[in-house]
UniProtKB/Swiss-Prot annotation:
UniProt xrefs under CDD domains: INT_Flp_C
Family note: Belongs to the 'phage' integrase family.
Domain of life: Eukaryota
Active site annotation, chain numbering: 358 (o-(3'-phospho-dna)-tyrosine intermediate)
InterPro entries: DNA_brk_join_enz, Integrase-like_cat_sf, Recombinase_Flp_C, Recombinase_Flp_N
UniProt-recorded name of the protein: Recombinase Flp protein
Gene name of the encoded protein: R
Domain Tyr recombinase Flp-type span(s) in chain numbering: 152-437
Organismal lineage: Eukaryota, Fungi, Dikarya, Ascomycota, Saccharomycotina
Species: Zygosaccharomyces rouxii
Matches recorded under PROSITE patterns: TYR_RECOMBINASE_FLP (PS51899)
Length: 490
C-alpha cells in the first residue's frame, strides 16, 4: 500500500517537473522541438513528442478563441497529453504522424499542424467512447446516482447547520478537532500545518486552496479599530483572481495568529508550484500542495464527527461552508458573501464557473465588526455596533501592552528561513503577540543591546523599532523591511 502511494507521489512530482520545463519553451521553439524529434530521434520518444504536440495545440486553441492571455492549465495539459500519448504513431517512410484527439471535426487541426510542422503529414482520429450497451447502462447508473448525491448533499447541509447553529457549537467543533490533531499526530510539522489549515479556513471563511496559495511575501501588519492590529496577506490565485486572508487576535482557543506563529517555526518556505504554462506571479506559497489531501485522509480516518464520515464530504474545505452558515445565522449574509468570496456578480478575466458562482473585488475589505464578531471579544448589535463581551478583556488595550521584541537574532532563530522572506515587522508583531498571549510576554524583558545599537522601545514605537533593527543589522545581512506599502531593501 505504501509502495503504491509512493509511486503515485513520484509520478505526480515527475509530471509537475516535466510540465514546468515544457512551459519554459516558447511556442515557435516547441515546433522546432517537434521537427527535431521526428527527424533525429529513434526510437521515437512518444511521451516527449506527445507533450510538445499537446502544448502547441492547446496554445493555438486558446489563441483562436481570442483567449490569448489565458494560460494553459497543467490539469488540462495532462488530460490531453495522455490521450495523444496512448494513440501516437509515426510512419517515417511517409512522414505521417497519427493520434487521437477530443474533437468532433479534426480537419482544422490537421490543416493547422501540417502548415506549421511542414513537411510532415498528420492523421487525427476522433477520440470517442464506444456507443454500446455499457455506455447506456452507465448513463442510467449516473442518473440514479445523481439522485442519491442530492440526498447526500442534503445530509451534508444538515450536518453543517448543526455545527453552525451557535457560537458554542461551531467553536466547540473546532476545539474538538484541534484536540484530535493534538492527540493523533506525532510530527510537530504535521501538527502545526493541520492546526493552521483548520483554524485559518474557519476564521477566514475561505477555501483551503486560497489559504494554500497565499503569497507569504505580502504579509503586512494592518490596524483595526476593534482588535488593535492584525496580519493580512494577498492571495494571487483564487476562483476570481484575487483576495486577502487575515490573521487576527481571538479570545478562545481558535486563534489563527498563534497557529501561524507555530507553523512558521516548524516549516521552511514552500516554493510556489507551477500550475499553468505561465511563470508564477510569486515565489512562495503558504502550504504545500499535498497537505490538503493528507489532511482529508487524516480527518476521515481519525475523526468520529458525522460530517467527516460522509463519503466525499467536505474536510479541508469545511471551514468555508460552516463559517458562511454561522454568519448567515447571525444575519451577516452579505458579509459572508464578501468574506468567503461568494456572489453571483460578474467580473472580467475570470472563468465561466467563477462568473456564475463567485465574486470578490480586492477593493472591498470586510468590515471591522466582522472580525470583532469572529474574534469572540465582541457581541454585535442589530445596528452593527460592537459591544465587549467582557469589559476586562479589551483586545485594543491588550495590543497596547504587548512588549515588542527588539532582538532580530531572536526572530531569525525563531522563524528560520521564513525570516528571510516574510517582512520583519510582521514577524516582530507575530512573535510578540504569541509570547504575550502564551504568558511568555509577562516575563520577557526587552534589554538594550549597546553592542548592536538596539535600544528598548517602551512605547512600542513602530517606526523607531524597525529603523533601529535595520540600522543594527544592515551590515551583517540583507533584510527586507516592509513598513506599510513601502519597501526598503539594503
Amino acid at each position: 500500500m505504501q509502495l503504491t502511494k509512493d509511486t503515485e507521489i513520484s509520478t505526480i512530482n515527475r509530471q509537475m517537473s516535466d510540465f514546468s520545463e515544457l512551459s519554459q519553451i516558447l511556442p515557435l521553439h516547441q515546433i522546432s522541438k517537434i521537427k527535431d524529434i521526428l527527424e533525429n530521434e529513434n526510437p521515437l520518444p512518444k511521451e516527449k513528442l506527445a507533450s510538445h504536440l499537446t502544448m502547441i495545440i492547446l496554445m493555438a486553441n486558446l489563441a483562436s478563441q481570442k483567449r490569448k492571455d489565458v494560460p494553459v492549465k497543467r490539469s488540462t495539459f495532462l488530460k490531453y497529453q495522455r490521450s495523444i500519448s496512448k494513440t501516437l504513431q509515426y510512419d517515417s517512410s511517409t512522414k505521417t504522424v497519427s493520434f487521437e484527439y477530443h474533437l468532433k471535426d479534426p480537419s482544422k487541426l490537421i490543416k493547422g499542424l501540417e502548415d506549421v510542422v511542414s513537411p510532415y503529414r498528420f492523421v487525427v482520429g476522433v477520440h470517442e467512447k464506444p456507443d454500446d450497451v455499457m455506455s447506456h447502462l452507465s448513463a442510467v447508473h449516473m442518473r440514479k446516482e445523481a439522485g442519491r448525491k442530492r440526498d447526500l448533499g442534503n445530509k451534508i447541509n444538515d450536518e453543517i447547520t448543526k455545527i453552525a447553529e451557535t457560537q458554542e457549537t461551531i467553536w466547540g467543533f473546532v476545539g474538538k478537532t484541534m484536540d484530535l490533531i493534538e492527540a493523533r499526530t506525532t510530527r510537530p510539522t504535521t501538527k502545526a500545518a493541520y492546526n493552521l489549515l483548520l483554524q485559518a479556513t474557519f476564521m477566514n471563511c475561505c477555501r483551503a486552496d486560497d489559504l494554500k496559495n497565499t503569497d507569504i511575501k505580502t504579509f503586512e501588519v494592518i490596524p483595526d479599530k476593534h482588535l488593535g492590529r492584525m496580519l493580512r496577506a494577498f492571495v494571487p490565485e483564487t476562483k476570481t483572481g484575487t483576495r486577502f486572508v487575515y490573521f487576527f487576535p481571538c479570545k478562545g482557543r481558535c486563534d489563527p495568529l498563534l497557529a501561524l506563529d507555530s507553523y512558521l517555526q516548524w516549516t521552511d518556505p514552500i516554493p510556489k508550484t507551477r500550475t499553468t504554462d505561465e511563470d508564477a506571479r510569486y515565489d512562495y506559497q503558504l502550504l504545500r500542495n499535498s497537505l490538503l489531501g493528507s489532511y482529508d485522509g487524516f480527518i476521515s480516518k481519525q475523526s468520529d464527527e458525522s460530517i467527516f464520515k460522509i463519503p466525499n464530504g467536505p474536510k479541508a474545505h469545511l471551514g468555508r461552508h460552516v463559517t458562511a452558515s454561522y454568519l448567515s445565522n447571525n444575519e451577516m449574509d452579505k458579509e459572508a458573501t464578501l468574506y468567503g468570496n461568494w456572489s453571483a456578480a460578474r467580473e472580467e478575466g475570470v472563468s465561466r464557473v467563477a462568473k456564475a458562482r463567485y465574486m470578490h473585488t480586492i477593493e472591498k475589505s470586510p468590515p471591522s465588526y466582522l472580525f470583532a464578531f469572529l474574534s469572540g471579544f465582541y457581541n454585535i448589535t442589530a445596528e452593527r455596533a460592537c459591544e465587549l463581551v467582557d469589559p476586562n478583556s479589551n483586545p485594543c488595550e491588550q495590543d497596547k501592552n504587548i512588549p515588542m521584541i527588539s532582538d532580530i537574532e531572536t526572530l531569525m532563530a525563531r522563524y528560520g528561513k521564513n525570516a528571510e522572506i516574510i517582512p520583519m515587522d510582521v514577524l516582530v508583531f507575530l512573535s510578540s503577540y504569541a509570547r504575550f498571549k502564551n504568558n511568555e510576554g509577562k516575563e520577557y524583558k526587552l534589554q538594550a543591546r549597546s553592542s548592536r545599537g538596539v535600544p528598548d522601545f517602551p512605547d512600542n514605537g513602530r517606526t523607531a523599532l524597525y529603523n533601529a533593527l535595520t540600522a543594527a543589522h544592515v551590515k551583517r545581512r540583507k533584510i527586507s523591511i516592509v513598513v506599510g506599502r513601502s519597501i526598503d531593501t539594503s
